[in-house]
Each structure stands twice: as C-alpha cells, then as structure tokens.
C-alpha cells in the first residue's frame, strides 16, 4: 500500500514496499574521511619514513618531531574572490643533533602552505574549485594467472607486485620448469633465487618448497651449486657489464627486496599476501595424509585421512602450522607451504613469501589453489585524496632529503641550523603540481548540484599508476559481478572512457585498506531470521557467501516467506533453501549510483538509455524557477542535502529574520546565528549559483533542516528541470530524428529560462615601453562608445552590452620611431601629449552580450596578490537570461534527448478536451526501438499525481507497478490507458487517434545554441596555408572538405567551387582584390593561384623535385612569393606610402580590417627594390634591440611597413642590408615575420597585439 513519507518540507506518496533498514551514509564522506586520515596519520607516517636523515659520515642527524597546521590566511569566499589557494601554513618541529659535540638544536620550520579541503569536499586552488577524483588501481600483492600453450599445456604465472619497488615474476614453460624474472630482466630458474636467499643445497630447497617433479626439473636447469654462485648469477642479470662479486650481489638483493625505503608493500599488500598464501584458504576440500599436531602444545588437531572443511582449516591455520601434506580428491599428494603470516607491519617481502609463492605455483599444477581474476574488485583498490596526496608529498620529501644530505656535507658544522639545511621548494612544488596539473585533480563540474556530487564520488582507472585509454581492453571496462553494491553498473561516460570511469554505489564505503565494501543484513542461520545487524563485506568476503536480494518477501517475524530463496553466489543466480542463506541486501538501490537512483522506473528502461539518462541529469542547467518532479524516487532530498548547495540549520531554533541575502536564527541556547546566502555568483561552468530562503520569520527549525534553497533545488529537494504537459504524437514532420516541438508559452513565461554569467578580465601590465594604463581616454574612439564607462574607464554595473563594446578602457604605449623633422616640430609645440599609445581595451567578444552584474578591481596599492608584471586587474561579470530557443537540447530522465526544432504559438498547439494546450510534443518513434518504457510509466503517473495535487516517489527496483499506476489514474478520474483525444490547434478538428498525454519531467541541458552558433566574414588565417582557421574559439570559417567539393563537382557548379577554393579561402591577392571590387562596386576579378598550391609545390621542391607549373600553351607560370605578391597588390591598388610607413586612411569597413589598406613597402614614386643602392650598416646595440622588438611583436613591425621603423628618414632599405653577411637566416626570419605580421594586422585590427 502506498504510504506518505516526509522529504524535507514536502510530503510524497511513496510506492516503496521495502522498509529502509539502514540510513544512507553521507554521500561525500569518501573525500572528507580520506583527507582527515591524511592530516591525522598520513603526514606523520611520511615524516617517520624519512626521519632521521644522516649525513654521509653519520655525524649530523636531522629528526622530524611533530607538525602543526596554522590558520588559513583568507576565508573560502575571499580565496575565490582573490584567486588564491585556500591553504594553511604547515610548520614542522625539527631537531638537529651533532654527535661529535652532543649539541642539539631544535627549531620550527615553515614547510609551505598546505591546501585545505572545504566542508563540501573540494579544494580551492588559485581561486577555482577543484576535486580530487579517487583512483581505482590494482592492489599490491601476489597474482596467479594461467595460459594455454599452443601445444595445449597449461602454463602458470605468478607476479608479486609492491606499491613501489621491483616486481618479481614467476613463470613455467612447456617442460614444467619454473623460471623467475627479477625486476623485468632476463629469466632465471626459480631455484637460483632460492639459493641466493640462503637455501644453498638442492636438499634445502626441496625441504623448504616441498619435493615435486617441477622443482626437480627446475634444479636440473639450474647451473649454480652454492649461494655465492647464485648471487653472482643474479648480479650479472641486474647489473650487466659490472664485475660481479658475491658481497655486492648480496647487498643488491638486500636493498632490492628487503629495504623498506626501496620496497614497500603497504599494509594492504602484506594483508593480501598473508590472505592468499595462508593455509586455511588452500587446504579446504582436501584430506590429511598424516596426523596433524599443534606445533607448540603437541595437541592432535586432526587424524590422518580426515576430510578438511572450512572450520578445521581455520583451526589448523590458527595453531600456526606452516606446512602440511594433503591428499587431493583425485588421489594426488601435495605439500602445501604457507608464508608463516608475517606481522601486518612488515612492509617488505620476506624469504618465506617467495618460498610460499613457488609452492603455490607447484600446487596449481596439481590442481590445488585458484588463479586470480584481475578485474575482480577484491583485487582492485581505491586510492582516495589522502593517499594520492601522500604519494605526491613523499616524492617532494625524498627530493628534500637529497638536498639536506648535500647541505650537511658542504656547510660548517658548528654554525649550521635546521632552518639552513631544509629547502622546502621540492615539497611545495610537488604539492602544487599535484593540485594544479595531476590528471586526477579536476576542475569541479558545477553545472548543477548533482554534477558536483557525482564528481566527488567518481572512481577513475586512469591517471598516474593506472591504465591508459589506449591500452585498456574490453575486460577491464566490463561490468563485473563484484561491482554489485560497490560500483554502479549504469553510470559511466559514453566514448573512449567507457567503463574506465565509474561511480560509487549509494551505500558503498571504502575500508582501511582501500577496498570497496557494501552493507548486508546478517541472516541468523539457526532461526532462519533476517536480523537488523548490518555487516559490511568486501568483494573477496562476499564471494564466500550466499546472498538474498532486498526484495525477497519476508514474514512478519523476519523469516523468508518462500521455501526457495533467489540468491546470488559469485556470478550465479541460485534458488536455495532459506537455511543456506548467509546475508540479504539492505536496499534495492544499493546496486546503483546517486544519479541512477534518481531515475524513476529505472527497471523499465534499457541499460544503455539509463546510462544516457544518468549522464544527462548532470548536464541540466539550473533554471530561473525551480520545480521538484511530480514523479521522484525519494532520493531528491538526500542528494540535495549532501551536495552542499543548500543552507542547513546547525541547531534547533527559531527564525528571527529571513531576507533575500541572509537568514538569522536564534538557537534554543539563545545564541544568534547569521547564515549568509550566495547571490548570483558564477559557477565553474558559467551557470548561476543563487540561494533563496524557504523559511519565514517565526518558523521553528530543527537541526539538519534546509533553511535556504540553492541552485536546482526546490523546498530542499533536487529540482533539475520542470514538469510539463507532454504528448507523444507526430506534428507536421517537425519530430524528425527525435526533435522536440515546444509551446511558445514556455518561452514567454520563462519556464525553461536560465541565467548564465560570463567572466572577462583585463590586466594592466608593465611593458618595455612603459606601463599600460586603465583609462577612459582612449585614442580614436567617439564619446558614444564611452557612454557607459565611469571616470576610471571601467563599465558601470547594470550597463547592457553588445559584441564589440568596451568593458575596460586600456591603452598601451607604442614604440617610438625615429621622428621626422615635421613630427619633431609638432612634438615641440604640443609637448608630450602626442606620445603614441595603442587602444588595447577589453571588449565584449564576438557573439556575446548581456548585462554587467559585477566589477572587481584588484591593484597592488590595495595589497592584492597579483602575478608579476601586473599592476592592475579588472574583472567584469556579465549575465544573460537565456530563454529556451530553437536548437537548444532537452532531455527527459530516461535517455530520451532531442533538439528543439520549432516553437509553436500557443493557439496552434494541439489541445485537450478541456482546452489545455500541450506544452511539449515528443516523437512516439523514440520509444519502441530505444526500449526506455520508463518514460511512459512516468507520464501516466505524473498526470495522475498532478491531477490529484500530490507528489509521488517511485524508488528504483521498488516502485509503482502497472496496477498502482492504473489505480492512481482511476482515482484521478483519468482514462485508465492514459490516452485522450487531442484537437488540432489550427483547425479545431480532433486527431484520428487518441494520444498518450501526461506530465513529464524535462531538463534543459548545458548544450545551448547560443554557445554554439557562429558566423564569420573575414578573420584570422593559418600561417602556412593561408586558409581561414577553424572553430568558434579561433573565430574560424566553415570547413569545405573533400566530400563537399565532390558535391559541387557533381552539380557542375564550377564557378561557385572555384571561388570557394580561391578568393574565399587562400588566394591571398585575390582576397584583397575581391574585397576592393566589392567595396567599389566593380566586377569581381579572376582568381589567382591558391597559397596551398604553392605550399604543395614547395614541398615537392623540398624533395629535390624540379616542379614547374605550365599553362595551356606550355609556358611556365611564375609563382611569386607571398611577399612579392603583397608588394605587387599594394602597387596595383595604388596605396600611397610615406617612407615605408602607411598613410593614415580610414579602413573601408570596420570589421574586415585593413585588408585593402596594407602597409606598402613600395609605391610608384619610389625606386624598385633592385634599384636601391646597397648600404652596409653596422648595427649598434639600440638598433639590434629594435630588430628584436620587431621579431617579438610582429604585428607592430608589420604596421610600420617592412623596415619596421629601422630605416633612416625617407630612405627605404633592403632587409638583407640590415644584417652582416653571417646573418642571412635572421634576415629570413624578419621576412617571415613581416609576411605574418601583415596578415595578423589585417585579421585582428590592433586587438591582439599583446
């Protein structure tokens, strides 16, 4: 029977049949717990690892005693505003002991600022919120695997993998010889390694590992006789080319495997080794050959010939028996040797581990033991923030240790202090690098609260020490049985990362070793009752148990209602009697992740569509007016609460005041607390973060209540979209390919309107020619352009701006050229005012507009931290209200996505019998083949819920069924089939068939048409091919590719094609002439030779092929260089020049730049290049500086004509003359830059000169 449940301030009718036994854990505890562990234990552990540091003589000793974290300099909000890192100073107490004099110096040393985690599990690095994603890696330990040889024989392999250190790999061959590879070198017989470890004779080896034909065959291959020989043999492999000596070899082996600094298994590696190699796991199912006796007390544990079950195996193991001969079911006899269970604190391997691994391999040949599945979650562990940070910190400390040792030997022993020894740079750099550029440190996805939450719960197999996309095969990516309750089988990205990035399941948690655990209810085997005792199991432990599903019916006393219970055991689904069941699931949603658990009727959707649904919910933009779904799953409240976007009451109390910007609560202990609300700030993704109070003055609040909604929340529940009236029908072909038809009402009433905030910044820097200045006094700009700027030259808040408008006025000093006599006179008369400055103002980018909502100014005078060379920084925030429009992408929660094709006036939309027009029309063809029937269930239940005026919850795998929905429809007096007659809005006639209609939750996704639409007339061109760049970011053109050319060829549209491939693309001269012809209203001239064709010729010539281009009559066509063509076109266009510098004249069109107004190098009035007499000019340093300046700033060089302002008075010079004979290549560079500079100048105007 459906029951009413409270979800925050709202009640929902829940169709759940299963009672919640366990409350869901905090959804971001994974991040917080890991970081807390790092601060508590992780840091301490590392300082202990490197302490004490001794110099090479052993006289000076440096010890790290303890550490403390200070208070952060700025609050979280201030850090975001000032673009600094939220961090606290780390101080370490260090003791320096001089053993000769016995002198002890203690000092507190500052070890850099350490980034702190915010309460929501993020870090603020340089003002941006970032998340450290947890990594799934292969756990350290030993892994056994098998392969079938082409001859049909089974070969076994064993690999011992440490967390850091040398790998040890064992393998067998066709002749049953066991080999070992030490640290990826050439293989040796495994007995050589055993000898080197101190088992000198053959007999000792056989006694240690157990006698078998495999070991005897390996001994036959082994040429060594003694421990020394074996050591030398290994040394030859590891250090080829060095003279071998037994002592050196022993030392090498010692450091390679038994030195804690060089070899580290971690606790988890030791735990896994002990677990895999222990007797109790290996002897179950065999029988004893001799009597088994307790090694210490002499007590008989088992007689000969007794079958060993689980209990007896544990008893033998706990007694400390390390080796046992057992009989297999097929009669074979095997000696099983364990590793002697070294203490969990031993982080290196021990001799007995290697013996036990070789013994395990021998047992595998006989059929005892099991090979490992590398993709099983028992063999993969999670490295969370704390551990990732610890590994990075360790690298920094190791580098620091090296520096300290060097300084100890160099500095004077008597006056030395700890502070002088320690160089914190490597540590600070390692931490900075980790947070700034590690693959696992991600810019937080803040599109909506769900995106934030999912980002923090993500598990990635990529990253340092993990897999790479290219190498990862299908097996790693597949859903595995051990994922049940640990990783979501649904939520993973589509594309190259599929299966490599997953999401933590709802109830999962991570244990001390980094393995994912999931909770189960224990079943009492005696009474057969399902208890409320909760046990967390790792994937390994789960494999031993038979587990019933959460929806298995129970009697009121907690026993199973059916005599056969459907259960899981490893990868099988079994029907077993209740007495055999060990555990039961706690909840049906423990299988899936948060995002997937938010999809109602998930059980009715095809998995691949559910995957799209859970991924697309994370892309929903927060809307202006939020609305929780009529049909939810009951997870909405919890996910909004844990995401941290809402304001939560910290204690019980009464609301004194609630305004738009703050809520004031008086607690019961009479304390008054002010909660500041976030107002219209920009998220990482440019969406709008805004909080609004949902309590009123006088309301009573309890601890943990939501008192203010954040973005995409409604009354404390997650609200990513809106409930709209949907019909599944065709509409004049506008549904083609999943397109969506919407009612104009949705635009008019701002149903799907969202606010987007863009940030633009402008820096005033120091340049070589003087400081840049932020000012209202901008050259060559009319007063109408400056109308919205204040006296400083910064736009006023509230101004409406369009593309190209000035946001911040800024001028940059121009390079001074040699002045002519006239200019000197003017300068003398008018003073400095005529000094040249360039307009480098910050303007609104192409295609953007909006209203200025905030301006922030940072200057050095105010003590703001600015990057070097920056004197002032201005940030302008621009907001846009984006109504829903054609081309926007929308989706439901079931993977049903589409693009809006048409917006229909309200009066033309189909309407219901009561006159209500439909809001959205979806294509009915999107349902059958996609198999996401959940949307149909949702639309029926939504209609009933809306009519009855209630909200309902249908939890995943435990929600409403067809019968429930039918009952709800009848209760609401709606047709039980959920269909109704619709009338055509244009004719008023009813449609032929009834149509499925109802309320459905629709999302507006982040792929907005305003961000994607783009157009260009002229713009930047590529340097080599001279073709327009591509893409919106580069302000590029539309690519006309090979296949498009075929299309025009097929039509025979020769002229269109010719002009697309020449004057509209890379015929440089043709472009200029065509532009001029259009401006003058003349006929467009014949196209010339495209630049890319010249590039092709040049490439062929570079292969030493003499390529000529001939015309129809066989005459050679001369292909001019780009620069010569430019000179020619300037002459053709009659551009007047003055001493190599262009005369100021208005450009024909503001945007197209100065394509026709090229800087002319020559003009008819001047001698041609050949006639210029050669002058050898020795360059003085100042001149060289100017050449360098011209090279650094190509645009400026181009603007002043070729000479770059270097020529004397009116004398134009040849480039080559500027350099001595040895400098031809430099001269070429200037030429190259000259060509480029002119192009840049055309394309960008002066804007891009920085």
Swiss-Prot record:
EC class of the enzyme, as a word: transferase
Keywords: DNA-directed RNA polymerase, Nucleotidyltransferase, Transcription, Transferase
Start and end residues of each stretch annotated as Disordered: 1139-1226
Recorded GO MF terms: DNA binding; DNA-directed RNA polymerase activity; ribonucleoside binding
Assembly: The RNAP catalytic core consists of 2 alpha, 1 beta, 1 beta' and 1 omega subunit. When a sigma factor is associated with the core the holoenzyme is formed, which can initiate transcription.
Protein family (similarity comment): Belongs to the RNA polymerase beta chain family.
NCBIfam families: PRK00405.1, rpoB
Protein name: DNA-directed RNA polymerase subunit beta
Gene name, Swiss-Prot/TrEMBL: rpoB
